[in-house]
């Protein structure tokens, strides 16, 4: 038989005996939450804004096909390498890694491109899928068809899209039929 009064008294005694520990835990929790909020407001957000301001000129050089200037900067403005190394954990820093992958891919430096595609941890669904699929493209160029196939299939299934899903399924199918067996290629499509 459960006595509510006795149970209440035991609970009350437990809290009374451990009041100091509960107070320390509560203060610690408040300090951690305040620290996280402060870090976000006073460190992470300003850093993300600085990164966004730093990347624009490199993006411009990329758009006009000046890959070396996009990668290394022009002396007055940083290139993607500087943005990625200085602001790597920000959205603009992650985007710089993606751009570096594309730049090195276009320059024919496929292993370097592959490394930067892997580094790009992007929030945007389309860019995340493209980074995955572009890894497959770089692996094809490096003659690693089996690894490329896995990346194409992963990219095709990451986010359903009228653009990226059929594109990467087609790449997977073509790669499969050229390097493996026709039956598997048909099954992939």
Language model region names:
Residues 21, 45, 84-93, 107, ...:
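Short solvent-exposed coil/turn linkers within tandem alpha-helical repeat scaffolds
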Residues 1-28:
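N-terminal positive-inside, membrane-proximal cytosolic segments immediately preceding the first
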């Amino acid at each position: 038989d459960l006595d509510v009064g006795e149970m209440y008294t035991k609970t009350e005694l437990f809290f009374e005996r451990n009041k100091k520990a509960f107070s320390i835990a509560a203060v610690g929790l408040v300090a951690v939450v305040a620290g996280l909020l402060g870090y976000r407001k006073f460190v992470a957000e300003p850093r993300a804004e600085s990164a966004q301001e730093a990347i624009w000129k490199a993006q411009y050089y990329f758009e006009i096909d000046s890959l070396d200037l996009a990668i290394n900067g022009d002396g007055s403005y940083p290139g993607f390498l500087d943005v990625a190394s200085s602001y790597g954990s920000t959205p603009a820093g992650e985007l710089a890694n993606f751009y570096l992958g594309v730049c090195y891919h276009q320059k024919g430096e496929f292993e370097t491109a592959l490394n930067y595609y892997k580094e790009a941890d992007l929030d945007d669904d389309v860019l995340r899928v493209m980074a995955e699929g572009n890894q497959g493209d770089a692996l094809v160029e490096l003659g690693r068809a089996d690894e490329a196939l896995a990346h194409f299939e992963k990219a095709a299934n990451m986010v359903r899209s009228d653009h990226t899903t059929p594109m990467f399924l087609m790449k997977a199918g073509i790669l499969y039929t050229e390097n493996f067996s026709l039956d598997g290629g048909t099954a992939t499509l």
